[in-house]
Amino acid sequence: MTLFILTETSAGYALLKAKDKKLLKRDDLSTETATPEGVSNLLKLKSFQKFDSAATALEEVASLVEGKVTPRLAGLLDEIKDEKKVSLAVADPKLGNAIGKLPGLDIQLVADSTTTDIYRAIREHLPTLIPGLLPQDMSTMSLGLSHSLARHKLKFSPDKIDTMIVQAIALLDDLDKELNNYAMRVKEWYGWHFPELAKILNDNIAYAKLVLKMGMRSNFESADLAEILPEEIEGAVKAAADRSMGTEISQEDLENIQALAEQVVGFSEYRQQLASYLTARMNAIAPNLTALVGELVGARLIAHAGSLTNLSKSPASTLQILGAEKALFRALKTKHDTPKYGLIYHASLIGQATGKNKGKMARVLAAKASLGLRVDALAEWDDDVTEEDKAALGTEARFNLERKLAAMEGKPLKPRGVAIAPNGTPAQPKKFDINEARKYNADADAMVDDEPKSAKKQKKLVEEVQDEEMADANGASDSDSSEEESSKKSKKGKSDLEKMAEKAGLSVKRYQRKLERGEIEFDAEGNPTAVSKKDLKKAKKEAKKASKGDDKKRKRSDEGEGVDNAEKKKKKKKKDE
């Protein structure tokens, strides 16, 4: 059987013919192919089909990597179609299976470990087998093709867009931390010059914009703050600037403070831009997951799993506790209850649920999210499909979950398509609101001796004597007096309880409970002491044992008295006789 060897190079396809039909079964193959002369004695070139350009080479090699037979390769194999009893050695088993499926090609394919030595020799001595191919040109073409193939793989990688989401959500979290640190630093720094501003203005971004706009607090009269602040807060800021107790700063200090304030404003604007970019990316890549859990929670789930494909392979139970691995393994180690939710806890549907319903909603939401993820990762859509059609599964599942949650919680249904905030209310588009900071209410202060003298009770020099009604005249007085006595007794009882509880070293409520259960004992002086349940049980057991012993003694004494009485009766009878 004639043996042909298919060789793919960066220059083109080469079809080699073995001079020995049993070449692959030889034991001395590695020694025979060690030199170029030995390889040329064993193999000869049957046909060589050169690539026209670097782009053609990239297309051909990319198809070979995926295990596909190109028309150029099929045309090369047509040359051996008419020969009888032919075997073809192929380096890639996947490519060998694809060649075997070609119609009209009756060839025995060899794609196993027996071809390893012969292919190693061909790659090492390829310029000697193909005439006109220089080693320098071969190395240059191989390097260029490898770079092009790497760029092609990176361009069409299914995980490349996931990387954008992972990086965006990580950057968003970092921006929040840095923005908070920078804003606090601006307040502390500018607070030396204008400390009252932080008490009046609560918003960090508005504070930074105000520092940039006003500069020194002495410029409050000429500065137009209407673009930043509402009228009432603007008036409060200007009034505070007029009578501020802050220290004076130099122009150089102000320039550095304003430079930091510019960073705060710039970071806040970029954060808004990044958040909108992340929302658009999530709606394009994982529309069903975004419809169910939101873009931020969905992005954190994808970042935690590494990619959308990895996340779609996870079952619903893994998706439910993703992000709570430490708590899970700690619970398994200590044999405690495992956590019910991880990152998915921050989804708005779970935020609406209360109590035990949170765990139920987490379980159901994870199940629906896992189905939506598989659609997002594996579905192949046509170009004319709209975004609403892609997210139809997630939107319908969210509507059903909202209806189920409303039935469990007993709340009215939210309108369909309305985003729901974690507190259960429909989420409105965010607005730039400036709220005045909380201030200390000085009017709420109260002192004991602050009352005016006129308000204090003064002793009357002459007391008026009023007529007292007789008890028989009005029966209501008896009831009033009885009520007063009962209230006095209750007050005395409360005070006594508090004293006894202090002596026992317990709170009043605990003292009352133990007193009702009989767990309080009193000594000879009447001081209470708390007794534990174990001590009470031991005392009861000892009392039972003691009572049993007394009963036995009584029985014995009764038996002895009965014997004595019988003897006395016998003696009396004898005397009478």
UniProtKB/Swiss-Prot annotation:
Alphabetized GO MF terms? snoRNA binding; snRNA binding
Q: Name the UniProt key words of this record, in alphabetical order.
A: Nucleus, Ribonucleoprotein, Ribosome biogenesis, rRNA processing
Is Ribonucleoprotein one of the keywords UniProt gives this record?
Answer: yes
Q: Which Pfam families match?
A: Nop, NOP5NT
**Entries under PROSITE patterns matching the protein:** NOP (PS51358)
Nucleus among the record's keywords?
yes
Q: Which GO terms describe its cellular component?
A: box C/D methylation guide snoRNP complex; nucleolus; small-subunit processome
Example GO biological process: box C/D sno(s)RNA 3'-end processing
Q: Which family does it belong to?
A: Belongs to the NOP5/NOP56 family.
User: What protein name is recorded for this chain?
Assistant: Nucleolar protein 58
